[in-house]
Each structure stands twice: as C-alpha cells, then as structure tokens.
C-alpha cells in the first residue's frame, strides 16, 4: 500500500459507486435506498461521504427531490419536544 508524503499514513482505497456496481439508476420510488443518502435532518449527503460518482450523485439528488415532492420522503424531519 502506498503512503502519502504529507502525513505518512496509508492512503485509503477509493470506494466504488454502489449504483454503478449494482448496475442500477437511483429511482424516486426506492425510498429505502434513498434514505441511506440523507442525514437525520433530511439533507442530502455529499459525494465524499457516500462514495457515489458525480453522475449518480446528480441523479440521486433529482430522485430525492422527486420523492420529497410526492411526499414519499419528508422535506423536513418531524421535530419532537
């Protein structure tokens, strides 16, 4: 394993895009899979956290927004006191 010069720690392998690996496209009807890419506050997670390719991240964002529009996903989390 190669080491980076600045920190001396081993570099981590780049994660492969889950959608590309499985050969699927993000779909607004697949709510369970879409929820994996949201924070507890309902925000879309960035690529650097999920390991999704740029193309699939754009499609994922569109699918999440469609699911929100159709009320399959919450736009904002329910607040509890």
Swiss-Prot record:
SUPFAM superfamilies membership: Ribosomal protein S18
Gene3D superfamilies the UniProt entry points to: Ribosomal protein S18
Coiled-coil ranges (or none): none
GO molecular function: small ribosomal subunit rRNA binding; structural constituent of ribosome
Biological processes, Gene Ontology terms: translation
Keywords associated with the record: Ribonucleoprotein, Ribosomal protein, RNA-binding, rRNA-binding
Any single GO CC term annotated in Swiss-Prot or TrEMBL for this entry: cytosolic small ribosomal subunit
Its biological purpose: Binds as a heterodimer with protein bS6 to the central domain of the 16S rRNA, where it helps stabilize the platform of the 30S subunit.
Family, per entry: Belongs to the bacterial ribosomal protein bS18 family.
Subunit structure: Part of the 30S ribosomal subunit. Forms a tight heterodimer with protein bS6.
NCBIfam families xref list: S18
Protein name, per record: Small ribosomal subunit protein bS18
Source organism (scientific name): Chloroflexus aurantiacus (strain ATCC 29366 / DSM 635 / J-10-fl)
Underlying gene: rpsR
